[in-house]
Amino acid sequence: MNNININIKIIKKKIQYFLKKNNYPLKKIKIIAVSKNQGIDKIKLAISSGIHEFGENYVQEGIDKIQKLKKYQNIIWHFIGKVQSNKTKIIAENFDWCQTIDREKIAILLNKYREKKSFPMNVLMQINISNEVTKNGICIKNYKKLAKTISLMPNLNFRGIMMMPEVEKKMIKQNDNYKNGNFIFNELKKEYQSIDTLSLGTSFDIENALLFHSNMIRIGRFIFKNQVR
């Protein structure tokens, strides 16, 4: 049994243990394997270990992998990097999800270029929940307007929000960010029937993300590099 297989088993067990310990419903938590800078062989090992959704940060690297792994028809590809206007066509034509819509122009362009496909692209709105100058994502005060724009795009399926909160020194402040994100998610659920996805949590904050009801976590290092304990 390889390390990737072992890591995935441990991560899944940790998730289910946390949910049970906190009396949360034993719901299905989607694990997105962040596969940037990972070789095809490692991705194949993850696939053989039961992972079927992968996140890519760089367009061309992602496209190369999609082409090389075409025979795996059940694989779902997420674009999780910053979306540049001149890359929207290739993203819309090749990826199943885009998790990082943070401005109206990007939503409009993705919708335009997705038209050739027979099914809409699943999308998330990226929110800069910590209001960091260096982070991508729309600021909290403007999210409602962007949500409305996305919801009106016929070739986009508006599924929810994605966040990457800043790592805070004080846990109370960290949890405030997660709490605010969960609040926005629930507000959007009231407004739009299609909303069902809160993409929150990485290798280093899985438990915190689950505590605030994330149902999609993005894990790279703990799958492909470290031996999880």
UniProtKB/Swiss-Prot annotation:
Q: Which Pfam families match?
A: Ala_racemase_N
List the keywords (alphabetical): Pyridoxal phosphate
Task: Output the PROSITE patterns linked to this UniProt entry.
Answer: UPF0001
Gene Ontology MF terms in the entry:
pyridoxal phosphate binding
SUPFAM superfamilies per UniProt: PLP-binding barrel (SSF51419)
Modification N6-(pyridoxal phosphate)lysine occurs at: K36
Domain of life where this protein originates:
Bacteria
Task: Provide the family line.
Answer: Belongs to the pyridoxal phosphate-binding protein YggS/PROSC family.
Q: How does it assemble?
A: Monomer.
The record's listing under HAMAP family reads:
PLP_homeostasis
Q: What does this protein do?
A: Pyridoxal 5'-phosphate (PLP)-binding protein, which is involved in PLP homeostasis.
Q: Which PANTHER family does the UniProt record give? A: PROLINE SYNTHETASE CO-TRANSCRIBED BACTERIAL HOMOLOG PROTEIN (PTHR10146), PYRIDOXAL PHOSPHATE HOMEOSTASIS PROTEIN (PTHR10146:SF14)
This chain belongs to the protein called Pyridoxal phosphate homeostasis protein
Give the originating organism: Buchnera aphidicola subsp. Schizaphis graminum (strain Sg)
Q: What is the lineage of its organism?
A: Bacteria, Pseudomonadati, Pseudomonadota, Gammaproteobacteria, Enterobacterales
